[in-house]
Amino acid sequence: MRYRPVIGLEIHVQLSTKTKAFCSCPADVFELPPNTAICPVCTGQPGALPVPNEEMIRFAVKTALALNCKIHKYSRFDRKNYFYPDLPKGYQISQYFYPIATEGFLEIDGDEGRKKVRIRRLHLEEDAGKLVHEGDSITRASYSLVDMNRCGVPLIEIVTEPDISSPREARVFMEKLRSIVRYLGVSTGDMEKGALRCDANISVVDTETGRQSNRVEVKNMNSFRFVEKALEYEFERIVKAMERGEDVERETRGWDMTTKTTVSMRGKEEESDYRYFPEPDIPPVVLSDEYLEEVKKELPELPDEKAKRFMREYDLPEYDAKVLTSSKELAEFFEECVKVVNRPKDLSNWIMTEVLRELNERNIEITESKLTPQHFADLFKLMDEGKISIKIAKEIFPEVFETGKMPSQIVEEKGLVQISDEKLIEELVKKAMEQNPKAVQDYKSGKKKAAGFFVGYVMRETKGKANPELTNRIIQKLLEGE
């Protein structure tokens, strides 16, 4: 490929602390009425002094450890100065000169196999407020309203090196990061609610000439799919400009969900534009060896480690293990099921197909469903005893999922118990053979597919309730013995 994208990400993770970064206002403000979770500190009133949230610092250290970062025992807060309607103080408290962590990495399944994406820095900062645009998009809004509730909500910003080689890899990185912060319990990672936000920097290299375009920042991508789509669009836009011999402007562009395009928002700021200087009202953060060791002991088993254990303990293929461990809740559900039904591979197949289909259709997590390990114990027992076929099991599963009823109850109510009476099935097959000698002859002349005719006959006569395995065995026995 002549043109190659070079992508780096700047990711904001909203931390699930009880209170905001520097005051006692609640941090969970998503569903609160506008401007109801604010105080003199988070709105920057004169004389109000910030007090750092220890839980925020602990969450940042946990995340940095999970991302293989170098933790700095000494870090400091700084003021990032800029004007925007949702920033009442006129500056944002962040970490610029001495971040809490640097030099990490996250392994992902890249386009050409396993790869490490380096993490340049991880630092703490407070969130700004939120502009609510009245119109179908930011570019066509007739006016905007300001909600200050989000001011002061604690964030960690994670900045990667430009190691990402495609829009797909950017999406995969984001999905993996969300999985990790959820495992750690430091964030919900919900992009739709703004708990995980991504700005991407993309440039394009012409591999034939070595020429590289200016870097463009892309914002307003509030789902994993939009991260990939926005970067695909921007890559194509930059390539077309380069092919025309045009210079690509260094700017910030926003993803427009309506038009599926990126639109210019403003020129790209330089870091010097923010006039960073040390925050005079907050002392440095100093971490002891004992504190770091204590936090390290709190780390849970993370997705990659859990996937390796699933492969080792349950003899699962790598793909199954990765899917099951992509969600902490799904992995826990699987292990609870294994305790009740010790058939890991069968359970994995059901969870990865039927369960995930139902969850995705409803856009919910496994913890929000009515499904329990006991449902699988009941379902597998029905199949093992020959009372229902796997076909019937899959047909009733959506109702099991929706209602929480036990499979045996649904089977009983709907009269779906499988017929496993050998004598009855044998009589039906013999009757079909007597009435259809041509099908018998076809089978004997080598057309083995003719057996399907007799299967269909038995299923019609029993309204689909005949045990398919038993039916096939009897048909083969009678046809071979003719």
Swiss-Prot record:
InterPro entries: Asn/Gln-tRNA_amidoTrfase_suB/E (IPR017959), Asn/Gln-tRNA_Trfase_suB/E_cat (IPR006075), Asn/Gln_amidotransferase (IPR018027), Asn/Gln_tRNA_amidoTrase-B-like (IPR003789), GatB (IPR004413), GatB_C_1 (IPR042114), GatB_Yqey_C_2 (IPR023168), Gln-tRNA_amidoTrfase_suB_CS (IPR017958). It is an enzyme of class 6 (ligase). Coiled coil: none annotated. Gene3D superfamilies: 1.10.10.410, GatB domain, N-terminal subdomain. PROSITE patterns: GATB. The keyword Ligase applies. The keyword Protein biosynthesis applies. One of its GO terms (biological process) is glutaminyl-tRNAGln biosynthesis via transamidation. GO terms for molecular function: asparaginyl-tRNA synthase (glutamine-hydrolyzing) activity; ATP binding; glutaminyl-tRNA synthase (glutamine-hydrolyzing) activity. SUPFAM superfamilies: GatB/YqeY motif, Glutamine synthetase/guanido kinase. Its EC number is 6.3.5.-. It catalyses: L-glutamyl-tRNA(Gln) + L-glutamine + ATP + H2O = L-glutaminyl-tRNA(Gln) + L-glutamate + ADP + phosphate + H(+); L-aspartyl-tRNA(Asn) + L-glutamine + ATP + H2O = L-asparaginyl-tRNA(Asn) + L-glutamate + ADP + phosphate + 2 H(+). Keywords: ATP-binding, Ligase, Nucleotide-binding, Protein biosynthesis. It comes from the Bacteria. Belongs to the GatB/GatE family. GatB subfamily. PANTHER family: GLUTAMYL-TRNA GLN AMIDOTRANSFERASE SUBUNIT B MITOCHONDRIAL AND PROKARYOTIC PET112-RELATED, GLUTAMYL-TRNA(GLN) AMIDOTRANSFERASE SUBUNIT B, MITOCHONDRIAL. Allows the formation of correctly charged Asn-tRNA(Asn) or Gln-tRNA(Gln) through the transamidation of misacylated Asp-tRNA(Asn) or Glu-tRNA(Gln) in organisms which lack either or both of asparaginyl-tRNA or glutaminyl-tRNA synthetases. The reaction takes place in the presence of glutamine and ATP through an activated phospho-Asp-tRNA(Asn) or phospho-Glu-tRNA(Gln). Heterotrimer of A, B and C subunits. This is Aspartyl/glutamyl-tRNA(Asn/Gln) amidotransferase subunit B. The gene is gatB.
